[in-house]
Amino acid sequence: MAAFDYQDFDREIWHKELEDFVPDTLYDMHTHMWCEAHKGALTGAPSGLRLEIDYQDHLDWAAKLYPGREFHLLVLGTPIPGMDAEGHNNWMAQELKADPESAINMMVTPDMSPEYVAEQ
C-alpha cells in the first residue's frame, strides 16, 4: 500500500471536530482492493487503480483515520481491461471472509455467462 501520511494537524482536527460527531460504526460504501497477482495480461508498472491494497490495509488505514471506530467495507471490483477478473473476484471474496459485516460486488465481464454468474 502507498505510504499513509497522517500528521499532528490531522489528529488535531479529529480530536477537536470529528471524534464526537463520527458514529461508532462506519461503512465505506465505495472502495477498491487490488492484488498484482491478478493483473492478467496487464503490463507496465502498477499505478492508479493498480494500487496494491488488501482488506487489512483498509483496516489499518481506517484505524488511523477513525481511531476507536468499527469499520466495514463495500468493496467494488477494480475494472481494468485485461486483468484476471475471476481471480480478482475470488481473492476479494477470500479477503472479506473475516468480516461478515462487509460485502463485495462481484465484477462481471461480458465474457461471463449468466449461468457462471448465478453459480457464484
Summary of predicted features, one role per range:
Residues 1-120:
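Helix-coil boundary/capping segments in enzymes
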